[in-house]
């Protein structure tokens, strides 16, 4: 039996703490997988994956990003990262978790999995700290047009002049998710997440999944995404690091696979060589709770084991 340990760890932002978990397998720890979750969700949603992988000897750990899940002081913190540089704070917290976990399990192969917003942070992480990893899984990612992201970032800055960084703009939120539910209208606004309607309803019933990002968080996220358009930044990624891209071919975040392929090409253009990709037919955005989630779990476990040799 695996051991699920809930933790509270310090953020790199003074005065802030992060909710985290560590799922420890029984017996030998063959590898560690650190998680970077998505926007407007929380890390405990990943516990079923963690328990599955622990059954294969893989320790899984992760924390709620600032402004998410249990990493809030009050509900006013939902969707707020940090000032003056929220993007840097999120990355620094991810790296602090890596350092903390490696101290507990020295010499054990170490991997990172990022989903959705967490995949954009994982891609930044690979450029800054990829030399500390043995591989990474990039899930539910995309490749947004640079001009659009720059416009959105500038808009956040302008709005913040008038409203402050903790303001929640419906316009920015609607722009960020524009068109995602196209063709699925009529039941909920979030059926693009998943073919499993019960999981969509569960998501919408949880206050940890229904808040609106502040201008601070949007600005921070857009700042990070823009870095992924910089060839000099991407060139810092270790060229031979094993990468696995996973996405549904009906996921609007990845433009039904087109955005995923563009993200991969941007890395290949930077000289990154060891990239695999799997698109799941009919699957939408949240692969870990999709109707084929067991297949996804098994693919993740098999890929990790393949890179332990």
Could you tell me what each predicted segment is?
Residues 48-76:
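Conserved alpha/beta-hydrolase
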Residues 122-208:
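Alpha/beta-hydrolase-fold enzymes
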Residues 1-27:
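N-terminal cap/lid segment of alpha/beta-hydrolase-fold proteins
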């Amino acid at each position: 039996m695996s051991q699920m340990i809930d933790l509270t760890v310090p953020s790199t932002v003074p005065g802030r703490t992060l909710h985290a978990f560590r799922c420890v397998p029984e017996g030998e720890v063959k590898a560690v997988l650190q998680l970077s979750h998505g926007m407007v969700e929380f890390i405990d949603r990943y516990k079923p994956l963690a328990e599955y992988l622990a059954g294969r000897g893989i320790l899984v750990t992760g924390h709620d990003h600032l402004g998410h899940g249990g990493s809030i002081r009050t509900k006013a913190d939902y969707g707020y990262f940090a000032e003056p540089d929220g993007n840097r704070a999120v990355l620094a917290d991810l790296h602090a978790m890596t350092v903390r976990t490696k101290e507990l399990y020295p010499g054990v192969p170490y991997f990172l999995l990022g989903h959705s917003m967490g995949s954009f942070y994982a891609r930044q992480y690979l450029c800054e700290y990829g030399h500390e990893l043995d591989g990474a899984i990039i899930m539910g990612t995309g490749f947004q047009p640079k001009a659009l992201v720059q416009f959105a970032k500038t808009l956040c800055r302008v709005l913040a002049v008038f409203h402050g960084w903790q303001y929640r703009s419906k316009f920015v939120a609607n722009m960020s998710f524009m068109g995602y539910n196209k063709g699925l209208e009529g039941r909920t606004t979030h059926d693009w997440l998943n073919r499993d309607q019960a999981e969509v309803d569960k998501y919408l019933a949880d206050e940890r999944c229904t808040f609106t990002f502040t201008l601070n968080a949007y600005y921070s996220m857009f700042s990070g995404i823009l870095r992924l358009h910089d060839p000099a930044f991407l060139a810092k990624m270790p060229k031979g690091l094993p990468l696995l891209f996973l996405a549904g071919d009906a996921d609007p975040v990845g433009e039904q696979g087109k955005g995923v392929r563009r993200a991969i090409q941007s890395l290949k253009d930077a000289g990154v060589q060891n990239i695999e990709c799997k698109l799941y037919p009919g699957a939408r955005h949240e692969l870990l709770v999709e109707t084929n989630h067991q297949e996804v779990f098994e693919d993740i476990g098999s890929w990790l084991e393949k890179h332990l040799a």
